[in-house]
Amino acid sequence: MEFLHRLGGESSREWAMRVVLQNIIHLVLPPGTSLSDKEIASFLSLSRTPVREALVLLEEMRFVDVYPQKGTFVSLLDVDDIEEGRYIRKCLESDTLIQACRSFSADGAIALEANLKMQQNALDTGDRKRFLFLDQDFHRLICSGCGRERVWSVISKNSLHFFRVRRLKIKGGGVGQGYFHEQHGELLEAILAHETDRALDILNRHLTWDVETVRASYPDYFTRDSMSKKMYMFMSEVAPVVAGAL
């Protein structure tokens, strides 16, 4: 697990939650990974109580599953969660792009151009994690450049499951980071040229790709088609008991 320094004013629970969540969405802790509150507490030099509280919150957010008698695990990817995150992002970003094409600040354009150069540097050096950060920040800068930075806060908080599978897609080598970088450049051109329809088309292509292709490459990372992992594990516990009673 990767260590993240504690932020000023951050409680022990908040810090533990941020560390575990970042490791989950960046796939340092892949879907299905066993989690130990004792080991996490030792890693962060915390007591187990705030770590347990953090895991409870992550379970509510559907990033962690707790199974009695079995343990705590990183949640498998659920297509419904992914599609919900994609939907939220497409709806809010599309509306923001319309505004950006109408009016975009000069400082915002400069910031996007600088971001694109840093993305290229990350590509050249093979720094995938850095590229993903800059990718997210590019979209935040679009929101900021048209006066809607708080919209990005809503998007980012509600599309983390989508981000996790997008990270997996890049890791798997399906659609490369160069492809996303190229689309970012096209988005900036469309915004500066006030070409709303073109910008919306680019965004649609940027966010729309088949989750099933990722699932085919990493089937063990996803929930089953008609039965979640939690139900599967529950049945694996119950079935022997029922069979023994017959």
What name fits each language-model region?
Residues 1-102, 107, 200, 211, ...:
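Short linear motifs at protein or domain termini
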Residues 25, 177-180:
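Anionic, Ser/Thr-rich low-complexity intrinsically disordered regions
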Residues 40, 60, 70, 128, ...:
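Generic intrinsically disordered, low-complexity segments enriched for polar/acidic and small residues
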Residues 78-79, 166-170:
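Short alpha-helical transmembrane interface motifs in multi-pass membrane proteins
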Residues 85, 106-168, 181-193, 197-209:
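Conserved amphipathic alpha-helical segments that form helical-bundle/coiled-coil interaction surfaces
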Residues 171-176:
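Solvent-exposed loop and edge beta-strand segments that line ligand/cofactor-binding
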